[in-house]
Structure formats: C-alpha cells, structure tokens
Amino acid sequence: MSDQHNLKEQLCFSLYNAQRQVNRYYSNKVFKKYNLTYPQFLVLTILWDESPVNVKKVVTELALDTGTVSPLLKRMEQVDLIKRERSEVDQREVFIHLTDKSETIRPELSNASDKVASASSLSQDEVKELNRLLGKVIHAFDETKEK
C-alpha cells in the first residue's frame, strides 16, 4: 500500500484527528463545568483582551463568516456570557460586551490553553514550532483562496 493511501501518512487526516482530540479534551476536561464550547471560549478570549468589540472584529479574528458568528453570539447572549448592543452612531454596527458571568469565569479559564499544551506532551519549543508550521499551512491556504 502506498503512503498516499495510508491515513496516518496524510497531512489532512493528521490535522483532522489532532483537532478532534484537542476539541474533545477541551469539551470533556476544561469547559464541561461551564457548559462552554471552544468557539464560545474563543469569543470570550477576544473580549477578555478588549471589550467591547464590534462583531466585525470577532468575525475577522476567528476567520469565520458572519453567518457562523451571529448564531454563536446569539447562543452566548442567551446564556448570559455576552451582551450585544447596537451602536448609537450607526445602528448597523453591533458591539459585544462581557457580562458579570463571563468576567467571573475568566480567572478559572485563563490557563485553558496551557492545560491543553501540557496534555499534548509537547515541550514549549515544540508548541512554538507546531504553531509556526500550522501558521505556514494556514497562510498557504489563505493565499490559494485569494487566487
């Protein structure tokens, strides 16, 4: 059997499987107590860095489209993780704010990424190198998308 047909030799399968394993770890070990999803955590991470922000910033930072982000934000608002407010200057612009609930869970989730890095059994240097290589892959596909 050639390497081309061996799943373990396919970059795409390795990326897919690693992503599934990391998401499972986040869901079962890190976020379960908070009934939080990884995309919700990413939104909170953006807001913990800077709040309020407009929806466009979240869309850009997460590299998702508005059609994906809007329902995500709606669910987060329903469980009191964020508050959405229309701009007084431009009613088309919506700002996202943290809530008391999202501020309360912040200290407990501040090291979530460290927990995953630790569980991965990679050294800090290996994590940096993996992030560099993944950034290269992401950039290459972004370039392909633009052509």
Curated annotation (Swiss-Prot):
Q: Name one GO biological process term.
A: response to stress
> What would be one Pfam family of this protein?
Staph_reg_Sar_Rot
Q: Which terms are listed as keywords in the entry?
A: Activator, Cytoplasm, DNA-binding, Repressor, Transcription, Transcription regulation, Virulence
Q: Which gene encodes it?
A: mgrA
**What SUPFAM superfamilies does this protein's entry cite?**
Winged helix' DNA-binding domain
Q: What is this protein called?
A: HTH-type transcriptional regulator MgrA
Q: For this UniProt entry, what's an example GO CC term?
A: cytoplasm
Q: Which residues bind DNA?
A: 55-78
Q: What are the recorded GO MF terms, alphabetically?
A: DNA binding; DNA-binding transcription factor activity
The record, for Gene3D superfamilies, names: Winged helix-like DNA-binding domain superfamily/Winged helix DNA-binding domain
Summarizing the function annotation, the protein's role is: Regulatory protein involved in autolytic activity, multidrug resistance and virulence. Negatively controls spa (surface protein A) transcription. Activates type 8 capsular polysaccharide (cap8) and nuclease (nuc) biosynthesis. Represses coagulase and protease production.
Quote the record's miscellaneous comment.
In strain Becker, gene disruption may lead to increase in alpha-hemolysin (hla).
List each copy of the HTH marR-type domain by range: 8-139
Where does the protein principally reside?
Answer: cytoplasm
Which InterPro entries does the record cross-reference, listed alphabetically?
Answer: HTH_MarR-typ (IPR000835), MarR/SlyA-like (IPR039422), Transc_reg_Sar_Rot_HTH (IPR055166), Tscrpt_reg_MarR-type_CS (IPR023187), WH-like_DNA-bd_sf (IPR036388), WH_DNA-bd_sf (IPR036390)
Tell where it localizes: Cytoplasm
